[in-house]
Amino acid sequence: MTDVTVKTLAAEIQTSVDRLVQQFADAGIPKSADDSVTAQEKQTLLSHLNREHGSAPDKLTLQRKTRSTLNVPGTGGKSKSVQIEVRKTRTFVKRDPQEAERLAAEEQAQREAEEQAQREAEITAKREAELKAEREAAEKAKRDASDKAKRDAAEKDKVSNQQTDEMTKTAQTEKARRENEAAELKRKAEEEARRKLEEDARRVAEEARRMAEENEKNGINPVEQTEDTSDYHVTTSQHARQAEDENDREVEGGRGRTRTASKTARPQKKGNKHAESKADREEARAAGRGGKGGKRKGSPLLQQGFQKPAQAVNRDVVIGETITVGDLANKMAVKGSQVIKAMMKLGAMATINQVIDQETAQLVAEEMGHKVILRRENELEEAVMSDRDTGAAAEPRAPVVTIMGHVDHGKTSLLDYIRSTKVASGEAGGITQHIGAYHVETDNGMITFLDTPGHAAFTSMRARGAQATDIVVLVVAADDGVMPQTIEAIQHAKAAQVPLVVAVNKIDKPEADMDRVKNELSQYGVMPEEWGGEAQFIPVSAKAGTGIDDLLNAILLQAEVLELKAIRNGMASGAVIESFLDKGRGPVATVLVREGTLNKGDIVLCGFEYGRVRAMRNELGQEVLEAGPSIPVEILGLSGVPAAGDEVTVVRDEKKAREVALYRQGKFREVKLARQQKSKLENMFANMTEGEVHEVNVVLKADVQGSVEAISDSLLKLSTDEVKVKIIGSGVGGITETDATLAAASNAILVGFNVRADASARKVIESESLDLRYYSVIYNLIDEVKAAMSGMLSPELKQQIIGLAEVRDVFKSPKFGAIAGCMVTEGNIKRHNPIRVLRDNVVIYEGELESLRRFKDDVNEVRNGMECGIGVKNYNDVRVGDMIEVFEIIEIQRTIA
């Protein structure tokens, strides 16, 4: 430690210099104010002051605080923090020398006393051990004397028993000789029987060995089985059975008791989990009664006797229309995790409580090796449908003819001429957008016509028309030939196995070519009769009326060949051709009766809907009371708008019809939800990028069900990878307040096709500023949705070269580095544009033009044929002969094709 002066020390201990000098003098150390003080001198001064002012403190107390936080769980599952402070106090006591000597003496005396007590305890223990050894020796001598006396008595008993045995042995020898003679004769007789038994036993053993080898080969371990020799109990009472067993043991107690006594007398270990109960011991003892010497052999108690089958058990699994994963696992007697694992292998994700459809459950069950029995849960529906009164007599009926073909080929005009009415002029845009059902009385008989739309959007309508028809009239324009919807109509007719009659329309035009139409149709399997085929080709003109009679005769001739018949009397059945919601009349369905007679007041079941026929009208709007086979009518009175294509059936009971309709609705909902929940692995990556896709939401309302279906399909087909059309809601009828609210909530476009919004809906549309559009032609609707989708597409970026400069020289600049002295050879060079540096026509750098100067002046643009200095940002390896290409990025708006 560095020495300090007296003055400094006085300042440290906060006392005066004179007082400190006086204290040093009293301690025998003469000092002045400027003299230095050593550590030894400080210690001497401190000792002097302690002696003078009294002793130093006897004890020193140290205090320490520690703070921490403890989380204590509280009510409601929440925890609260509690601040904890731990205070520790430690006291150090300075012992007086005399006191220390006194304490040391006390400790020494205590140690000596403990040693003395330990020595006395050892002596006492030694004395007790000697006394115990003496007692044990005396007891051993007493036991030896007693054992010797017992052995002497046993020896005497043994000698007497031997004498008695010798006397009885002589008598028994004579008796045994006589018995041996009789036994010899008996042995010879039994030997033959034993030989036969041994042969039988050898054969049985060989069979058992062979079966054991087969079981071992199949992986089945035989379980040792004990031979149950116990008697059957006469009574079922438990106490009576125990008493009966006790009596049996007393009677047969001599058998094997000596050998089993030691085993049964052993005490069981305390706490043994597998200790046998009393009933188990009784059962085991009873099972071993007849054994030799009391020995019994058997499988240990508590051993699992179930063995895993060598082969999987195949079960008959009955599956309804929907089933949960857990129920399917129970039916197959496997764990639910195994079913989920099997579904993941098939590419479907599911949980234990998820509802899956019948097809998925069938695939999973068959994959796991079980036989599937599909059950249709429609007993009520079958009972209602079977309880129908249909007449047995079938009568000839009128043919149902569907007119199909490409758009604008003259289908409706042809039918218009046949009916002698102006139907085509009433269609919006001059194209058919519904299925028109008409029956026409001709001189040769009645014909029912179905006029289908030819536009590409109405594929499902044409398919329904082909399914409900007997004959298809394919209209082909002689000047236009085969078109896409013509090919589609041929495919629908072939799928429905319906004969074709080809009407070559517009034959009066100068550019009409009949042979061209025949050649083109022959490529799709429609061969004319004159070429050896089956199709009739009739040249007609819907405008001039040429060939119309020939077409009708061809239709009736084809109908005669088909021999069309139907049951006229009885409960009717048919199909829904079209359906819509009329504001005044409610749900309206156009029904084509196939068989039976539909009467006003009949109870009908139609898909998910039911009701009583309140009124019927024909295609002219006239009220009718009944409709026979092949007659199209409009019916009123259904509970809702049915789907086009649904079966219409007349039933007896309205209550049962309602139950069937509700059952169909619930089942359809279950199946729909089950299919929606199915999440396949291949869709997982599509869902990951779903946020990057723009969506055009549409709420669609139309006048008829077929138009809703056609427009929905057309709009969904417009979807691309970047923009998707989503039909938020659709329906038949006018635009209501509910539709407007739905469009506002989902930010959707309201589209009305041949319908209008009511007053309440218009208020919501105005207040929410919704986009409402009315259409009457499907072309315009699709084009405008395409335009809306095009506006959501991200623009395409294109690079356009605006200038090219050749490096003539390179200069060094302290501010920008290498500066290229260039000559502009093409276009213009603009500042802050992206550039490319080309060397030998190869791009070696792509960056930004940082500096552009001409005659030491910064400029924004240099034109063709002028010199300039170019500084490239973050690039200094510019050489003479390089080309600097300047370009700009322009955006090009994309459109939906």
From Swiss-Prot:
InterPro entries according to UniProt: DNA-bd_dom_put_sf, EF-G-like_DII, EFTu-like_2, IF2_assoc_dom_bac, IF2_II, IF2_N, P-loop_NTPase, Small_GTP-bd
CDD domains reported in the protein's UniProt record: IF2_eIF5B (cd01887), IF2_mtIF2_II (cd03702), mtIF2_IVc (cd03692)
Residue ranges, annotated region (Disordered): 52-310
Superkingdom classification of source: Bacteria
G5 as annotated region, ranges: 541-543
Cellular localization per UniProt: Cytoplasm
Segments of skewed composition (Basic residues): 256-272
Keyword Nucleus among UniProt keywords: no
Chain positions recorded as GTP binding sites: 405-412, 451-455, 505-508
Domain named tr-type G: residues: 396-565
Chain positions covered by the region annotation G4: 505-508
Region (G1): 405-412
Keywords: Cytoplasm, GTP-binding, Initiation factor, Nucleotide-binding, Protein biosynthesis
Region (G3) location: 451-454
Bias type Basic and acidic residues, positions: 85-159, 166-217, 273-286
Function: One of the essential components for the initiation of protein synthesis. Protects formylmethionyl-tRNA from spontaneous hydrolysis and promotes its binding to the 30S ribosomal subunits. Also involved in the hydrolysis of GTP during the formation of the 70S ribosomal complex.
Full protein name: Translation initiation factor IF-2
Organism for this UniProt entry: Enterobacter cloacae
Name of the encoding gene: infB
